[in-house]
A protein has these predicted regions:
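Bilobed "Venus flytrap"/periplasmic-binding protein-like clamshell domains
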Residues: 54, 75-90, 122, 144-198, ...
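A ligand-binding cleft/hinge motif common to bilobed small-molecule-binding domains
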Residues: 105, 121-131, 178-181, 207-242
Length: 288
């Protein structure tokens, strides 16, 4: 009887030990963000972006120019956002891991902890601040018009001169909201991404895209039939400070990550940002 009891006790202890190991493995697997370690032993900085929003970010087939492999993909990500992300990761002694996420999924991915940060050309609006925190700006993006070079809109000297245009922009952006400032505008439904916006303009579905300078400049650089139209400050699109400040979205209360990133960004000037952006515009795939 004693032997049977000891045998059963051994089986019980073995089962309990296995169960504890499973739980421990599950807890370890659930640790995300900066706690994750790469094969190198470094922490991993998980950054989300669309990888389809040149010149801020795009996808390419190789690591040419310093592109970073997209997690779970054979593609690589590059662009202004990746250049900034690499600087941040290097300063933090972390390995950079890029996650390709649709625009509408970026903030939720930050909130859930799927990624540590969204570096994706995101304006620091009050609405977004309800769900995420933002770092100091890593770019300042003036709102402009993107039109066909041979269109009447190309001669506009003010937003008022765009009267009666057929316009659209990207979904859930401040650009789409700015369209309402154009007199008698015909506002089409918003488009999911920047490539879709360009197609709509080139195909004649619309004759005006409202966007920011980097996006318009990159589109015109890659498409000779398009041009960017800028306006004097008193005749341009009326925007708030938060509309033009582009920040990095991080989880609310993550002061450690915010401080680490802000330390790097505070050491950079607007001229530094513009220099990196110009480099990104020249390197975008369609610019070659």
């Amino acid at each position: 009887m004693k032997g049977v009891f000891l045998m059963n006790l051994k089986k019980f202890l073995k089962a309990a030990l296995c169960g504890a190991m499973v739980v421990a493995m599950a807890v370890t697997a659930g640790c995300g963000g900066g706690d994750k370690k790469a094969d190198s032993g470094k922490k991993v900085l998980k950054v989300g972006m669309e990888c389809a929003y040149a010149p801020y970010n795009w996808s390419q087939s190789s690591a040419d120019g310093g592109a970073v492999k997209i997690a779970g993909s054979n593609e690589y990500a590059y662009g202004y956002d990746v250049m900034i992300a690499k600087k941040l990761a290097d300063s933090m002694g972390a390995d950079l891991e890029i996650h390709k996420i649709e625009w509408d999924g970026l903030a939720p991915a930050v909130v859930s902890g799927k990624i540590d940060a969204a570096i994706a050309g995101m304006s620091t609006t009050s609405k977004r601040k309800e769900s995420v925190d933002f770092t100091k700006p890593y770019y300042y993006a003036t709102v402009v018009a993107l039109v066909k070079k041979d269109s009447p809109q190309a001669q506009a000297k003010s937003v008022a001169d765009l009267k009666g245009s057929i316009a659209t922009s990207q979904l859930n952006t401040i650009w789409y909201d700015q369209i309402d400032q154009v007199p008698d505008v015909k506002k089409l439904p918003a488009i999911d991404n920047v490539p879709g916006m360009i197609v709509a303009l080139k195909s004649g579905k619309c004759n005006l895209i409202v966007t920011d300078i980097p996006t318009a400049k990159a589109a015109a650089f890659a498409n000779p039939d398009l041009t960017m139209v800028t306006f004097p400050e008193d005749k341009g699109f009326k925007t708030s400070k938060e509309d033009v400040e582009i920040g990095i979205a991080i989880k609310k209360g993550n002061k450690e990550l915010a401080d680490a990133m802000n330390k790097v960004l505070s050491g950079m000037t607007e001229a530094d940002f513009n220099k990196i952006m110009d480099e990104a515009i020249k390197k975008q795939p369609l610019a070659k």
